[in-house]
């Protein structure tokens, strides 16, 4: 008979016990497996934090990608949904952002996207047909009314509702986006598969939300943000029936948690969240396209330069020596350098608050109009042209209003006129 050492028997016993424990844990995991929900949305073109202030440096698609990737590695049954309203305000640069956002969403892979008013403003022709846009209260539109997902052995139906009040529809045509009604809910119920769990992506009024709540038909209702102030985030949507969870505005946070949870948790996308590497090429390409957009407008703007009303701070020095010295020692006199350091000295959305008269026949580029670089006298006092012709003609001054043109929202969350004004006060 072959003899085994005590240590050998001990090792076998340990492996046996570990095997039993692993089987038990695996069984427990299978029994308790359930969908892990992640919800985003309401980006409104804020593809990346501007970086103007550390305390408001939140959000961005690259940080979202990192967090989502980490959760996917931890939860095999992850269900990712997006509440839409992601596109920026219409503009030439906005179109570049739109393209980046949709390319990023392809990599982030949401199961469903609810198109919001911002998407509607650009027109359906701009919506990428390879993305899972969803609008359940639409008729005769090329988008599904319901998206089904099998997760953790459960069938989940994702429905989407956007109130017609937020969408432009030609008054001479029959409406193709319908308001909530008993007939609409009954139509949805007739399309539903028995035994399914149902989730509603919603953007509308509290009265409309109550209609859906009172139907008792949905397991969860998730609300797109109606809040415009990112410095005062509101994550609760009040209704007469019960409060609902509302996504943070401007993409600054995500909702996440198991589907059985009464309340999902908020994960804020703060400065300590790294950028997701797979999105880096998209942002590099976007920066190059924005630069080309900027350069393409220079020739046209140069032709208008002879009509400029701005003269630059150097023209003020002779008569306003002390004021000029005060300006030179302030951060305003180096405003453009803060953009140059991060490669944003060609980005129109940034330049408007870092130079004089951008897109107003003023600053063109640091090479063509260096005299109008940085925040100068004319940013606050207005054009000095008439004052130079007649020194007794003083430009109007509303210091507070001049400040809040740029020191606003997440760009300057700590702004307080009473503490900021003394830093640049001059006579």
Roles of regions detected by a PLM:
Residues 18-28:
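Bacterial N-terminal signal peptides
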Residues 32-282:
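Acidic, metal/ion-coordinating pockets
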Residues 34, 43-49, 168-170, 263-427:
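Short sequence/structural segments immediately N-terminal
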Residues 8, 25-27, 35:
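Generic alpha-helical structural signal
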Residues 26-31, 158, 369:
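N-terminal cationic amphipathic segment used for targeting or macromolecule association
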Residues 1-12:
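N-terminal secretory signal peptides that target proteins for export/translocation
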């Amino acid at each position: 008979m072959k003899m085994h050492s005590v240590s050998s028997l001990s090792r076998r016993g340990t492996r046996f016990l570990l095997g039993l424990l692993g089987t038990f844990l695996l069984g427990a995991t299978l029994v308790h497996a359930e969908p892990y929900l992640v919800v985003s949305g309401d980006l409104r073109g804020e593809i990346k934090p501007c970086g103007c202030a550390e305390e408001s440096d939140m959000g961005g698609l690259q940080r979202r990608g990192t967090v989502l990737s980490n959760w996917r590695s931890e939860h095999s049954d992850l269900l990712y949904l997006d509440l839409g309203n992601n596109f920026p305000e219409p503009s030439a640069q906005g179109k570049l952002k739109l393209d980046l956002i949709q390319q990023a969403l392809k990599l982030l892979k949401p199961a469903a996207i609810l198109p919001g008013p911002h998407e509607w403003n650009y027109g359906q022709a701009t919506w990428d047909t390879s993305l899972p846009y969803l609008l359940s209260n639409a008729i005769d539109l090329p988008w599904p009314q319901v998206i089904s997902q099998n997760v953790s052995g459960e069938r989940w139906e994702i429905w989407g509702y956007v109130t017609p009040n937020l969408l432009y529809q030609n008054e001479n045509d029959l409406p193709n986006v319908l308001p909530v009604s008993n007939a609409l809910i009954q139509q949805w119920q007739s399309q539903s598969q028995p035994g399914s769990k149902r989730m509603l992506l919603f953007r509308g009024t509290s009265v409309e939300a109550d209609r859906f709540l009172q139907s008792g038909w949905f397991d969860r209702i998730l609300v797109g943000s109606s809040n415009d102030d990112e410095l005062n985030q509101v994550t609760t949507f009040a209704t007469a029936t019960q409060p609902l969870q509302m996504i943070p505005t401007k993409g600054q946070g995500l909702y996440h948690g198991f589907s059985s949870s009464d309340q999902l948790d908020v994960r804020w996308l703060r400065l300590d969240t790294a950028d997701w590497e797979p999105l880096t090429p998209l942002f590099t390409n976007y920066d190059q396209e924005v630069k080309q957009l900027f350069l393409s407008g220079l020739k046209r703007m140069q032709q208008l330069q002879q009509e400029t009303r701005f003269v630059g701070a150097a023209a003020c020095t002779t008569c306003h020596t002390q004021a000029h010295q005060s300006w030179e020692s302030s951060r305003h006199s180096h405003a453009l350098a803060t953009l140059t350091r991060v490669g944003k000295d060609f980005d129109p959305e940034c330049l408007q608050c870092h130079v004089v008269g951008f897109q107003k026949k003023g600053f063109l580029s640091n090479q063509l109009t260096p005299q109008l670089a940085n925040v100068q006298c004319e940013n606050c006092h207005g054009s000095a042209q008439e004052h130079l012709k007649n020194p007794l003609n003083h430009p109007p001054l509303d210091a507070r209003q001049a400040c809040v043109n740029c020191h606003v929202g997440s760009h300057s969350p700590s702004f307080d006129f009473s503490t900021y004004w003394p830093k640049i006060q001059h006579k």
